Amino acid sequence: MKDLRVIFFGTPRFACEILKALIEEKYHIVAVVSQPDKPVGRKRKIMPTPVHELADAHGIPVLQPAKLRLQADEVLAYQPDLIVTCAYGQMIPDVILDAPAYGCLNIHPSLLPKYRGGAPVHRAVMNGDEETGVCLMEMVHAMDAGDVFARRIVKIDEEDTTETLNLKLEKAGCDLIREALPGVVDGTLKGEPQGENYTLARNIAPEEEKVSFAAEDVNVIYNHIRGLIDWPIAYGVIEGKRIKFYAVRRKTEENDHVPGTVMGFEDGCMKIACMKGYLYVKELQPEGKSRMDAKAFANGAGRALTGKVFE
């Protein structure tokens, strides 16, 4: 079974951990397909994707097509018996999906059929869900619609962000692929149809990054902010400038303040009045500045915002 020729598709850290599990389990990874490397940081230095970096470390050939459908022949030249994908980032064309004798499998970070699509982890946190999970599923021509072979439930704590939840899901996904893949390949583990009662987890739109203090209560705002950590990061606008929110907590308490009012700084946090409570911002990034803690911000220009109102 582990002599099967496997091609792995993936890009970010989450996918990197799944690839690492396959390598540790001695599967024969003949090639890896990842998104093109991109410039990062202020110096815009080209950096390899996490999956690219891991594949290089193990001497595995890497393909990084900008448009996969135009380079399908290069992928199929590796004659895969099985394809495994996780957070790749492009639609895989039918000519590739139909090629492997053992099919194409995907590790998806939600409890399908809930949250098909590109941002299932973000949406679970933003919606205040108490649990999510990972599924090992068959890839079909419709997005995230294939039969589910196995799943694992993961609890979402109140303090979890998308960043911390991804770490939990990475571990669950690695455990799942180790336990379930042999049964899928030898035919002893059968898939279950998802049915038609599904929900979508659309990608985060730029306009969703802005927090609306006037329209949402403290619980919605808190979930919104932690759902966008560590990317793309939620922000508020005050005095015409953006402030990004990196670490927050909340306190539920009825009050008569105008939502979005900066009440001052206490316990190392910027305190903002919201409907049904207060938001405490511990780490932030003022427009044009570096990320800092709220205490440092207060000692600079921050305290002058007391009494001002976020849009």
Segment roles from a protein language model:
Residues 1-232, 277-280, 286, 305-311:
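One-carbon transfer enzymes
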Residues 214-311:
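An anion-binding loop in the catalytic cleft
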